[in-house]
From Swiss-Prot:
Its cofactor is Zn(2+). The gene is Lvrn. The lineage of its organism: Eukaryota, Metazoa, Chordata, Craniata, Vertebrata. Glycans are attached at residues 121, 129, 258, 285, 343. It comes from Mus musculus. PANTHER family: AMINOPEPTIDASE Q, PROTEASE M1 ZINC METALLOPROTEASE. GO terms for biological process: proteolysis. This is Aminopeptidase Q.
Length: 559
């Protein structure tokens, strides 16, 4: 092959120099733009060391400013993909293991008033002090937070030994910024926290009460006694606590909570624990508000934190010295539509206490029938929330099937007081440990109270046959999956499916069948006692089943 002829464009030396200069300028512009290219918005405290955070703007690392949205708008914060974040722990969906939460002092103030039931932008304000233990030295802290605005952020500590509030110093907060894709708020500190020491993280924040979605802190509008009324309630499971307050929003990061709710005097405030006391607060407009405080909770995950602010009516029952209150519209209470739910809840608690020989650990139970509740029912510890359609029964309705259905729904949520609340799965990939056993004991309780209802046949044809059919599908899955497959909220939400509930119930039914009910319950007793106020994984359950099988096998061998 012969050498090809040269071809091209020829320019003069002057033109070449001009092109070179333009290229250099272009490169400088690109470098400048790259330096402005940030990951996420952040908020700058003042240069004087004051930890008050401006809540009027969001600042990316390069200094460019975006205007904060009005409360009714979606935030205009650039996503991490849009802004090209630097590499860091905020790239991951799980919290880094730098801090362990120990206790939350949480105050929430929903600005709901009876004469302003449907404001265009109903908001809430709040404060939280989180006591944490540092496990890894770091000058950067990550917590979960989503769609919250911050007014003040402070870090105090290290805390003095053997006390919770006494502090021996203060840690400078140099910068506060957000990683909205991963739903983190990030604190850049002036110094690293000391491993083994305890600190207090303090936040003043605000957010929206949702009027469309029914997650986080949301509003219900309804009619009662021929009047328009309103209430606010919470739904934190699985990952919506971060919509209400900054927190460590993972199920294994349990802590105790002191909860305070500020509300209009015309409303009642409910939370997980009994009321501790009430006082009065006057706002800047001179309006009077009631401050209701509650007793300290046991150690529990953030997804079980609950509150309701309402003017519902209630009826009370007492079971083994503990009060059970059922709340609903005044009309429904007056008509006796909640009597059956109130009468059956106590015996359900007693049945499970006797079965496991483990008492219900909270001093009270409130059951609230919401006019609208998209989740259907939620097992918040001490404050169970239902859609009212799941609980209402006309007193003259003697239909056993209707009563059995209401009983089964209540039984499922009461079962969670042991499976999920007392013992919680370590991560959402094992949510079947909560839902599967609650679904199984829902069947057992219905059989116990209504033996003439063919629940075994119903279970066989609707649950077992149904899941066997679905298990042949291409999209079938195991009840427990790899942790890394379920980290985003959308992925976690998909776990609340028929495989978790129905296949999980079938797993429990199978275990009870081949172990025998006696060994099965003994294994569950051991499991619940060992992991009370803590977390467990699927393998922990298998170990406790093995623990009851081995002695029984030896007994059979000797006899």
């Amino acid at each position: 092959m012969s050498r090809p002829f040269s071809s091209g464009v020829y320019v003069s030396r002057g033109v070449a120099l001009l092109l070179a200069a333009l290229t250099a300028v272009l490169l400088l512009v690109l470098v400048a733009l790259a330096s402005l290219y940030g990951s996420c918005a952040h908020v700058q405290p003042s240069e004087q060391g004051n930890s008050r955070v401006k809540n009027t703007s969001l600042w990316p690392p390069g200094g460019q400013e975006w205007a904060l949205p009005t409360p009714a708008q979606e935030p205009t914060v650039g996503t991490s993909q849009d802004l090209g974040p630097p590499s860091g722990p905020w790239d991951h969906l799980r919290l880094p293991p730098w801090l362990v939460p120990l206790h939350y002092d949480l105050e929430l103030w929903p600005w709901l008033q009876p004469d302003k039931l449907s404001p265009p932008n109903l908001t809430f304000t709040g404060r939280v002090n989180i006591t944490v233990r540092c496990t890894v030295a770091s000058s950067r802290l990550l917590l979960h937070s989503f769609l919250l605005n911050y007014k003040q952020v402070e870090v105090w500590g290290p805390l003095a030994q053997d006390t919770r509030n006494a502090t021996v110093g203060r840690v400078q907060v140099e910068k506060v910024w957000f990683a909205p894709d991963m739903q983190f708020v990030v604190l850049d500190l002036g110094q690293s926290l000391e491993p083994g020491s305890r600190y207090e993280l303090s936040f003043h924040f605000s957010g929206q009460v949702l009027q469309v979605g029914l997650e986080g802190l949301f509003l219900n509008l309804y009619h009662d006694e021929d009047e328009l009324r309103a209430l606010v309630a919470t739904q934190m499971e699985p990952t919506f606590a971060r919509h209400v307050f900054p927190c460590f929003d993972e199920p294994a990061l349990k802590a105790t909570f002191n909860i305070t709710v500020i509300h209009h005097p015309g409303y009642a405030a409910l939370s997980n624990m009994p009321q501790l006391g009430q006082s009065e607060r006057i706002d800047v407009n001179g309006s009077r508000w009631t401050v209701t405080t509650f007793h300290t909770t046991p150690r529990m995950p953030t997804y079980l934190v609950a509150l309701v602010v309402c003017d519902l009516d209630h009826i009370s029952r007492t079971e083994r010295g503990k009060e059970i209150r059922v709340w609903a519209r005044k009309d429904d209470i007056a008509n006796g539509y909640l009597d059956f739910a109130a009468n059956i809840t106590g015996p359900i608690f007693s049945f499970l206490e006797d079965l496991f020989n483990i008492s219900y650990r909270l001093p009270k139970t409130d059951i609230v029938a919401l006019p609208i509740f998209a989740s259907g029912a939620m097992e918040n510890w001490g404050l169970l929330i239902f859609d009212e359609s799941s609980l209402l029964l006309e007193p003259e309705d003697e239909l056993t099937e209707k009563r059995a259905m209401i009983l089964s729904i209540i039984a499922h949520e009461v079962g969670h007081q042991w499976f999920g609340n007392l013992v919680t799965m370590s991560w959402w990939n094992n949510i079947w440990l909560n839902e599967g056993f609650a679904s199984y004991f829902e069947l057992e309780l219905t059989n116990y109270f209504y033996p003439k209802v063919p629940m075994n046949m119903i279970f066989f044809f609707t649950v077992l046959h149904g899941i066997l059919g679905e298990d042949h599908a291409l999209e079938s899955r195991a009840v427990s999956t790899a942790v890394e497959n379920f980290t985003e909220t959308s992925e976690i939400n998909r776990l609340f499916d028929l495989y978790t509930y129905k296949k999980g119930a079938c797993m429990a039914w199978m275990l009870a069948s081949f172990l025998s009910p006696h060994l099965f319950i003994n294994a569950l007793k051991s499991y619940l006692e060992t992991f009370s106020y803590s977390n467990a994984e699927q393998d922990d359950l298998w170990r406790h089943i093995q623990m009851v099988i081995v002695p029984f096998r030896h007994f059979l061998a000797e006899h």
